[in-house]
């Protein structure tokens, strides 16, 4: 086997030769091939990820661990991360999605946290195609099948349809866990002279080379890639969670690591390198699912539901007993030693002897050339054909609210257990999901956002708006943000125009995080989302996490009361470019989305949080996809009551009601609170736009929409 | 007054039930590992919680029904003491022969997680004495195999013996197969044994026991059990 076949570039191979002072053998070459793949090494994205601000007062553990941890108050931490499982889900939707959920849950577990909730980001192709139907059904069933069984509620997410995801659907899985601040597990605490224990499933040939497979474009014949997809067993994962938490609670493990991409090699070498110890592993001692597996297969297998534990000699017996209690395979497979050597043995023979730090940390960065897309000016030239639209708003609202990306997603969320663990205060279907923390009484608010349409018109502004739009729902609910995690889904970085879009989007995200003091605590990059030259649009996905103190109750949507005054806060000059309206009616994305406005965001944050804390409104919703019209429609449906809207517009009504972007929200305020509400929003654009009541939504100069018709359109009934 | 909550491998509502009993309802409750052969001293109520015992492999509840602890649970039931099976726990009770019937795949062939309206059919049981007969209550369901099935003649017997305690209902109070989200015969959501001391139901009362989670209709079940154990009503 030569280095190219292993997936290495010649420059990378030269470094390996120089560092080792010899040629690597086949096992070693395969290890480097996987560990230095894009998926494991982040070699293309590392220079960009440095742009993210990572510090924050409430960050307990930041980037570099399996997941970031933020301070949730009173000695409790929240560990969270979002990760992609795009390639596997494109090939084998059920298992690809299921193992995506399982993988992120183990990342959270590896921090010592009990996983308490998941969210899923789903991006599908043409909603009418047979392929999308097969993929979306399989992916949704996979997310549910795994999450439901393992007992982690799926409490929200994001679903978007665009033909550019036809061959490359995206599955981004987010998980959050709760951990006592003093019990956070770090991968830097292993000591020499400890046992290396493998707990969980037996090791088989599934998923070998999965990380490398995720680091290139998908082939047109996805069936050929099936062997690279892992098979999940949520039942074993549930046992693994309980066993690991019990081991931690009893102080039996020094550190632990989940096994995801590149299996034993990755998890073991990471602990060794981060803790500054060496490791000797005897692959003969790994419990196998099938016979005659060779050394590199065992070392790189991505069999699911396995954890690597580092155990002091005096605790070994108790750990083995715990494995027995939970009916899990539990085997000593090696030991930690002084030094930096990572040694794999099998049948008395040494198959690999490498510096531990070189395996995970030696891969050089690649700085791909970036080039502003030649057609960008053309993309950004915008001519809004107002003449094509009547001034009636009811018909476009009814069409848009029934569009695939905006309509009700009950067919998805009903298949997810969103309530297990009895913490779900706000489940799926709202811009923000809310959990209570039994342990300290605080509430956690979580949002997930991605704006590929806006990003494809202006990746910098799109990145900025994505980040801001993920924070606004938190603020409106009354939460203060603690941090964010992101999943950067892009096509190949080797195309300079695509790399430029990637870079700009990351800069936009990073600038917004810096402007609003939101630390980035974890993340994941998924590149090469393209098939035969067909690329996904730039899709940076953000999950933001915030906290509402125990003394406050959250301000949620769907609670309009008769007689409430409706207020629109924020600027009226939002943008049609990149909006749902443009995508759905004009079929063609063009123009430039709004530029960032950090001061507006900060002002909005302050007032929104105060509004919730003072309980000034009955209901509130940030303006998201579909703008003011969709916000009014959804609030009306969820509250089961209509409203009469009167609003003068300086421009075409469509531009006011369907434009998107910027710090904006719709509040329903009871009459008695109107003076205090307006005082609270002093210094910010605010306008009373209507009154709640009746059984129809009446938009200006438009036919009233009876509630039942509006709800049926949204539900697709 | 002590409750034991059995933990099978794959149970995932055990901690929820412990929370509802212990923290919310004030009934001291302890987890019991399924490999135990005796129940803790003083156990008056045994709860088999929801989840995916043994991953639902083979058949939901089939393997858990053969766990070591089940002998003690059966003994407990035969003595006329209280056993409550929720969701997967209901499936285990039918597999263990402590309740009649079987829970088949939902008629939609999909997992369903949703709030459900139930009509309380009996209020003379240890589990429902704090409800009003015919009252509509809201508990969520979350299952893939919740279609209650019995052959016709046995179903008739079940009805004649007034063993149906909860039925899926609509807001107007009507209840039956048409109102059941999963296709359960006669809209059956929960039943007791002939003696009335063993209840199995698919909906989750522990998920409807706190205002912050959206409803408190489940609280009355815990209060019913409490007052029955305290000898307040039978």
Region annotations inferred by a language model:
Chain A
Residues 1-6, 10, 16-29, 167-169, ...:
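Glycine-/charge-enriched secondary-structure boundary and capping motifs
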Residues 233, 593-599:
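Catalytic nucleotidyltransferase
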Residues 30-239, 245-248, 254, 269-273, ...:
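Glycine-rich phosphate/pyrophosphate-binding loop regions near the starts of catalytic domains
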């Amino acid at each position: 086997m030569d280095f190219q076949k292993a997936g290495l570039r010649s420059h990378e191979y030269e470094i390996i030769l120089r560092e080792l002072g010899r040629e690597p053998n086949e096992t070693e070459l395969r290890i480097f091939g996987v560990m230095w793949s894009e998926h494991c090494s982040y070699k293309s994205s590392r220079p960009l990820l440095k742009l993210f601000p990572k510090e924050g007062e409430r960050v307990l553990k930041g980037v570099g661990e399996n997941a970031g941890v933020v301070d949730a108050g009173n000695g409790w931490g929240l560990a969270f991360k979002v990760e992609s499982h795009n390639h596997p889900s494109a090939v084998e939707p059920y298992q690809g999605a299921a193992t995506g959920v399982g993988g992120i849950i183990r990342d959270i577990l590896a921090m010592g946290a009990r996983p308490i909730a998941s969210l899923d980001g789903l991006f599908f192709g043409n909603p009418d195609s047979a392929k999308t139907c097969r993929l979306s059904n399989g992916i949704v069933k996979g997310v549910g099948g795994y999450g439901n069984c393992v007992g982690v509620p799926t409490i929200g997410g994001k679903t978007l349809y665009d033909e550019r995801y036809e061959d490359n659907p995206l599955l981004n899985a987010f998980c959050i866990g709760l951990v006592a601040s003093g019990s956070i597990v770090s991968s830097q605490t292993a000591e020499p002279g400890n046992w290396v224990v493998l707990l969980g499933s037996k090791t088989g040939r599934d998923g070998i080379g999965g990380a490398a497979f995720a680091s290139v474009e998908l082939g047109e014949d996805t069936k050929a890639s099936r062997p690279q997809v892992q098979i999940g067993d949520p039942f074993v994962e549930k046992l693994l969670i309980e066993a690991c938490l019990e081991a931690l609670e009893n102080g039996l493990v020094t550190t632990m690591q989940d096994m995801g991409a590149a299996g034993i090699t990755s998890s073991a070498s990471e602990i060794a390198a981060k803790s500054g110890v060496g490791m000797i592993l005897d692959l003969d001692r790994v419990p196998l699912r099938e016979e005659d597996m060779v050394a590199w297969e065992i070392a790189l297998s991505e069999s699911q539901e396995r954890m690597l534990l580092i155990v002091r000699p005096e605790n070994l017996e108790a750990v083995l007993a715990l494995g027995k209690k939970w009916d899990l395979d539990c085997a000593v497979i090696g030991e930690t030693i002084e030094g930096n050597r990572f040694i794999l043995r099998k049948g008395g023979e040494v198959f690999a002897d490498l510096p531990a730090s070189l395996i995970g940390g030696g891969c050089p960065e690649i700085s791909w050339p970036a080039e502003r897309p030649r057609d960008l000016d053309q993309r950004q030239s915008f001519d809004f054909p107002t003449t094509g639209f009547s001034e009636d708003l009811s018909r476009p609202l009814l069409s848009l609210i029934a569009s695939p990306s905006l309509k009700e997603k009950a067919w998805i969320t009903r298949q997810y257990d969103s309530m297990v663990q009895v913490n779900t205060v706000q489940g799926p279907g709202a811009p923000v999901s809310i959990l209570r923390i039994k342990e300290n009484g605080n509430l956690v608010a979580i949002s997930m956002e991605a704006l590929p349409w806006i990003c494809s018109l202006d990746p910098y502004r799109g990145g900025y708006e994505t980040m801001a739009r993920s924070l606004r729902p938190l603020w409106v609910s009354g939460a203060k943000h603690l941090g964010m995690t992101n999943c950067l889904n892009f096509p190949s970085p080797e195309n300079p125009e695509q790399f430029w879009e990637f870079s700009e989007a990351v800069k936009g995200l990073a600038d917004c995080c810096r402007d609003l003091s939101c630390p980035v605590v974890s993340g994941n990059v998924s590149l090469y989302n393209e098939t035969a030259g067909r690329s996904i649009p730039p899709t940076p996905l953000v999950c933001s996490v915030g906290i509402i103190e125990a003394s406050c109750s959250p301000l949620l949507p769907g609670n309009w009361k008769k007689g409430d005054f409706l207020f629109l806060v924020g600027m009226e000059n939002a943008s049609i470019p990149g909006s749902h309206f443009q995508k759905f009616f004009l079929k063609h994305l063009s123009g430039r989305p709004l530029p960032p406005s950090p001061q507006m965001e900060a002002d909005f944050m302050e007032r929104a949080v105060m509004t919730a804390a003072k309980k000034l409104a009955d209901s509130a919703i940030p303006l998201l996809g579909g703008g003011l019209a969709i916000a009014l429609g959804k609030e009306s449906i969820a509250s089961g009551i209509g409203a009469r809207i009167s609003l003068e517009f300086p421009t075409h009504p469509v531009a006011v009601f369907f434009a998107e972007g910027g710090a904006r929200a719709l509040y329903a305020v009871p009459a008695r609170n109107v003076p205090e509400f307006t005082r609270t929003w002093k210094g910010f654009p605010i306008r009373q736009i209507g009154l709640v009541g009746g059984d129809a939504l009446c938009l200006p100069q438009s036919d009233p929409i009876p509630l039942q018709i509006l709800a049926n359109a949204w539900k697709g009934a | 007054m002590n409750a034991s909550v059995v933990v099978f491998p794959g149970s995932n509502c055990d901690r929820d039930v412990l929370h509802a009993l212990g923290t919310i309802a004030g009934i001291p409750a302890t987890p019991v590992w399924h490999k135990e052969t005796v129940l803790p001293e003083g156990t008056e109520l045994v709860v088999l919680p929801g989840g995916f015992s043994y991953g639902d492999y083979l058949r939901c509840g089939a393997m858990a029904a053969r766990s070591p602890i089940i002998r003690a649970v059966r003994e407990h039931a035969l003595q006329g003491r209280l056993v409550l099976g929720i969701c997967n726990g209901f499936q285990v009770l039918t597999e263990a022969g402590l309740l009649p019937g079987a829970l088949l795949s939902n008629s939609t062939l999909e997992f369903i997680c949703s709030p459900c309206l139930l009509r309380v059919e009996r209020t003379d049981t240890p589990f429902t004495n704090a409800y009003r007969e015919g009252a509509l209550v809201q508990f969520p369901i979350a299952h893939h195999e919740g279609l209650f099935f019995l052959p016709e003649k046995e179903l008739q017997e079940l009805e004649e013996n007034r063993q149906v305690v909860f039925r899926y209902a609509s807001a107007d109070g009507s209840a039956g197969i048409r109102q059941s989200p999963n296709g359960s015969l006669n809209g059956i959501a929960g039943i007791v044994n002939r003696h009335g001391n063993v209840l199995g139901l698919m909906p989750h009362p522990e998920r409807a026991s706190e205002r912050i989670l959206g409803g408190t209709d489940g609280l009355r079940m815990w209060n019913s059990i409490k007052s029955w154990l305290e000898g307040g009503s039978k």
